[in-house]
Amino acid sequence: MKRRIALAIGALALTAAGASHAQGTLSMTKDGATVTVYGDIDYYLSYMTSSSGSKQIALQDGAYLRTRLGFKGDKDLGNGYFAKFTAEQGLNETSGAQADATRLFDRQLWAGIATPGGEFRFGRQNTAIFYRGSYIDFTGRTLGSVVNVFGTPSRYDSDIAYISPRWAGFLAEVHYSIQGSQPQHSTNQAVSQGALDWEYGPFRVGYAGIAGRPPAGSVVDKTVFYNNFYGNWDYGKGKVYLAFVRSNNQSTTPGTPSGTLNNGGNPLGTTGALVTGTDTGANTYYNIYQVSADYYVAPTVRVGALYGQIKDTTNDVKNANGWGIGAYWDVTKDVMVYGLGNSLSNDPGAGFRPSGSAGLSKPFTSPADVNGQRIRMGAFGMVYKF
């Protein structure tokens, strides 16, 4: 079965590639339907140090835009209605491996219909919070972002979504994942989302939130949530960003070769795991504060900086703070080169680590290098989009 699916995808890619010679894009249009092959390759060389004394040089994947291959399409049904689909697979550029070996399309696989009154989608799809990364800070909430090291719930299975048009500056979005939903049943683990964004001239403010319920009667009977408030101002030559997050979606994670990292786990998960009701990390609540700004020194060159704090408001022991600086150069419309520097300082009880659009292929994994340590990183990389 997997072989037949792979052959079908290959045939579709070849067909679209053939059409691209005539059209200048990786798209094919027939009878009002358009199918596009898209993706990117993002790789970077990193130099990372820990205040423990450890150092590491590595080729990593996905600082800014995780490597991926996708297919998307739409068909005009008339009267302002369109049928749509997206199928997207994450890849690791450093090894050629799938981001998730258990799924063919781990990032997205959904179908829907766009109407004059909004868009309806069904399937595995990105969260409302995930889509708003570019509203959060100059990195697009990727490598260098303090908000990003906390972990962002990114996508869920069996998700039903509605996205409104923008009316009077407002855009609303709601999701309900029935992946674990069993109404009136003790194992109901539904995941719900809501978002509201307002845009007026150079100003934007908004909220995006997600919550997952544990099974009834769980040992840790806490709803796990992630609430993100944001605002930004386009001052003409760049933007200023403010972000605040309130969440209990953090926990410990196993270290290597042994021991435990004080942070890095997520009771709600970041790519589709449901709340089991057994993770005591859900008992600890955090506030995250971050300020960021960027500036275009040239039409194709942007520089930026940020500073953020993670505050453990329950026990005051898992605090961290960090900063990031970076520069992005759009060499062509398809190629971007970037350089980044960032620092993350953990309190003795904290164990946060840097993370990009993709998790680091080669992170520090020993508790001695992470817990209570200051981790610094320099990165230089490139994104090629097609």
Model-found features: residue ranges?
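Short sequence motifs at beta-strands and strand-loop junctions characteristic
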Residues: 61-64, 101-103, 152-154, 186-188, ...
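N-terminal signal peptide c-region/cleavage motif recognized by signal peptidases
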Residues: 17-19
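Flexible, surface-exposed loop regions and adjacent strand-edge segments
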Residues: 101-103, 139-142, 257-267, 320-323, ...
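Outer membrane beta-barrel
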Residues: 24-48, 56-181, 188-190, 194-205, ...
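Detector for outer-membrane/organellar transmembrane beta-barrel domains
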Residues: 193-324, 329, 341-342
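Outer-membrane beta-barrel "beta-signal"
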Residues: 331, 370-386
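Extracellular loop and loop/strand-boundary signature of outer-membrane beta-barrel proteins
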Residues: 54-57, 97, 146-148, 179-182, ...
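Outer-membrane beta-barrel proteins
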Residues: 48-52, 94-97, 131-134, 181-186, ...
